[in-house]
């Protein structure tokens, strides 16, 4: 059943994206010939007015066909005034940008709703879990509140800063000699906790962890939900969108770095994550839907044809030049763009296969 909802979620995002193009085209006086979900052979269609609506067989996207969007297209004289390339540049940009804009606005709306209703998760000063076999397992229990480490309380720091300083204090205890994985620190950490209303103090010797590159005692903090007002929820949603946008930009501008290439994911990977997330509850499913919608909007704004961003880019070039770009240039730009899109597709597919099976296409 979870796979069904993943499919429904993807369909919803595609429909809303194309609906953005559709309604913007109608609002700017363009003629829309088709509004289809998916590609390939037609499964079902119906015509209402001048537009044919339908569903095709291959679930890899959707499209809105606007009269005159192809420069080589022969437009009947009666539809000439409503053709895409007969409209001013600003109207074309509005129509093309409307699809990604809907995805970004939808992402913001979902994030705002989730943060406003459920609040924001914050790290709690209480122990969430204790790692078996580590020093903390001998003295700490889930629910214990950490009061001080080595007598340090950091009362002026925020909750997250205080916990980070606690961790650095523990990490300052080093093994005698060379720091090797699993070695025991030469000095103990004094932990002051509050348990059932009573204060207790324990001393434990941290173990050096090679991966963390510092000494640890082996516990993690719990989480609590901080209530947010409408303004704070909107700010949190905006911050999340900015973080994803800047991260996406960083990945695409550093694709020659192997670690960044590994961040690219495709339909298979997103579907697999969606399947797992939906089983963990509505909130996580909504958050995933928001971030997939945001990614769909951002990726479509990349300035390469046939993506929406490519159409926006060449419309701006036309505006700056004062005349349309030649058909030959547009064709070459489209060929390059399709090659880049296919590269992203196969790179994402390779990474997805690698994550699921441990093997990929070894793109290096």
Where are these regions (language model features)?
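Divalent metal-coordination and catalytic microenvironments
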Residues: 17, 55, 99, 300, ...
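Active-site His/Glu-centered metal-binding helix of metallohydrolases
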Residues: 19-24, 101, 105, 302, ...
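Membrane-embedded helix-turn/re-entrant segments that form the catalytic/gating core
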Residues: 26-107, 225-228, 315-324
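Membrane interface segments of multi-pass transport proteins and intramembrane proteases
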Residues: 44-47, 126-131, 230, 315-332, ...
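PDZ peptide-recognition modules
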Residues: 74-90, 98, 102-268, 358-364
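Transmembrane alpha-helix interface/packing and boundary motifs in multi-pass membrane proteins
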Residues: 253-258, 293-307
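Small-residue-enriched transmembrane helix starts and helix-helix packing motifs
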Residues: 281-298
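Final/C-terminal transmembrane alpha-helix of multipass membrane proteins
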Residues: 334-352
């Amino acid at each position: 059943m979870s796979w069904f909802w993943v499919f429904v979620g993807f369909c919803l995002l595609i429909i809303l994206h194309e609906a953005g193009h559709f309604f913007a085209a109608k609002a700017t006086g363009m003629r829309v010939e088709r509004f289809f979900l998916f590609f390939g052979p037609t499964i079902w269609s119906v015509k209402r007015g001048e537009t044919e609506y339908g569903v095709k067989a291959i679930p890899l996207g959707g499209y809105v066909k606007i009269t005159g969007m192809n420069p080589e297209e022969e437009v009947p004289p009666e539809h000439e005034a409503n053709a895409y390339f007969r409209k001013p540049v600003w109207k074309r940009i509005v129509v093309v940008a409307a699809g990604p804009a809907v995805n970004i606005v939808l992402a913001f709306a979902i994030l705002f709703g989730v943060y406003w209703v459920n609040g924001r998760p914050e790290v709690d000063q209480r122990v969430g879990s204790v790692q078996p076999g580590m020093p903390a397992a001998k003295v700490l229990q889930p629910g214990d509140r950490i009061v001080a480490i080595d007598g340090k309380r950091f009362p002026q720091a925020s909750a997250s800063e205080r916990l980070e300083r606690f961790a650095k204090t523990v990490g300052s205890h080093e093994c005698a000699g060379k720091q090797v994985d699993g070695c025991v620190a030469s000095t103990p950490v004094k932990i002051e906790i509050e348990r059932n209303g009573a204060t207790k103090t324990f001393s434990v010797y941290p173990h050096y962890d090679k991966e963390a590159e510092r000494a640890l005692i082996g516990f993690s903090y719990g989480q609590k939900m901080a209530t947010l007002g409408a303004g704070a929820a909107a700010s949190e949603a905006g911050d999340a969108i900015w973080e994803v946008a800047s991260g996406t930009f960083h990945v695409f501008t550093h694709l020659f770095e192997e670690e960044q290439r590994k961040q690219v994911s495709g339909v298979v990977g997103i579907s697999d994550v969606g399947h797992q997330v939906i089983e963990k509850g509505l909130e996580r499913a909504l958050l995933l839907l928001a971030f997939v919608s945001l990614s769909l909007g951002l990726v479509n704004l990349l300035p390469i044809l046939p993506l929406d961003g490519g159409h926006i880019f060449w419309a701006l070039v036309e505006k700056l030049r004062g005349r349309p770009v030649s058909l030959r240039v547009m064709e070459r730009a489209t060929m390059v763009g399709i090659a880049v899109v296919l590269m992203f597709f196969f790179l994402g597919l390779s990474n997805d296969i690698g994550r699921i099976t441990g093997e990929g296409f070894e793109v290096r």
